[in-house]
């Protein structure tokens, strides 16, 4: 019986790359994202290429009710999740901390922190009961140090690091493992989303002589 991996934010970028890698290893996949069309295309690709079983879970990770319903009502053959990849996340805008859009702050915090925590709470108890499991949180090097215009996003990724460290401590008396992966800049749609679809803005650098650079 193949192992099962559940990946959030799987429709593109790092999430889709993770799905392809696990598919190569013969995993049964539970793929989550908001974009049903992209998920369906990925499902077809993976099932055709690797002959694996893929179940789609199209919901917004910020929707606690939808997340709980999807995970607690999984068909029996998909319930024994071996690997959870908390990948769903985003950055919005490059405004100064005191001048940003409140709705953007809410979206980043709800997606990058709260949803990760809620999904983990839904999946980990089953792993503990089965005596095995691996939680992989996709953090960022941005969680180690802030950069101009990114303080809120950086704060959310710092939270991912702390949540990962804390969960690892909480599970120290179990066989479960916790990994916090911290990528740097990756060529995905991440920056396009950040700038509301403005691809030119993604290529603009930071102006010189920021306060932090002054001597």
Residue ranges and their predicted role:
Residues 36-37, 58-69, 102:
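The beta1-alpha1 cofactor-binding region of Rossmann-like NAD(H)/NADP(H)-dependent oxidoreductases
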Residues 25-41:
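Conserved glycine-rich Rossmann-like NAD(P)H-binding loop of the short-chain dehydrogenase/reductase
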Residues 95-109:
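Substrate-binding pocket helix/loop in short-chain dehydrogenase/reductase
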Residues 176, 180-184, 188, 200-215:
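C-terminal helical subdomain
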Residues 120, 156:
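Active-site helix of classical SDR
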Residues 11-12:
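Conserved glycine-rich cofactor-binding loop
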Residues 140:
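Residue(s) in the substrate-gating loop at a strand-loop-helix junction
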């Amino acid at each position: 019986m193949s192992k099962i991996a559940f990946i959030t934010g799987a429709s593109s970028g790092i999430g889709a790359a993770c799905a392809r890698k696990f598919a190569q290893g013969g995993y049964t996949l539970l793929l989550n994202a908001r974009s049903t069309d992209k998920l369906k295309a990925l499902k077809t690709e993976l099932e055709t290429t690797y002959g694996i079983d893929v179940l789609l879970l199209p919901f917004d990770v910020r929707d606690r009710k939808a997340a709980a319903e999807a995970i607690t009502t999984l068909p029996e053959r998909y319930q024994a999740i071996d690997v959870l990849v908390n990948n769903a996340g985003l950055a919005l805008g490059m405004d100064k901390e005191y001048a940003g859009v409140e709705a953007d702050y809410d979206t980043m915090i709800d997606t990058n922190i709260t949803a990760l925590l809620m999904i983990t709470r839904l999946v980990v108890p089953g792993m503990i009961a089965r005596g095995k499991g691996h939680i992989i949180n996709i953090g960022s090097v941005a969680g180690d140090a802030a950069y101009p215009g990114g303080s809120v996003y950086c704060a959310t990724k710092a939270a991912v690091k702390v949540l990962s460290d804390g969960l690892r401590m909480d599970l120290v008396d179990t066989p479960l493992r916790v990994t916090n992966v911290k990528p740097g800049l990756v060529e995905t749609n991440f920056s396009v989303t950040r700038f509301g679809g403005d691809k030119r803005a993604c290529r603009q650098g930071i102006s010189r002589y920021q306060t932090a650079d002054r001597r």
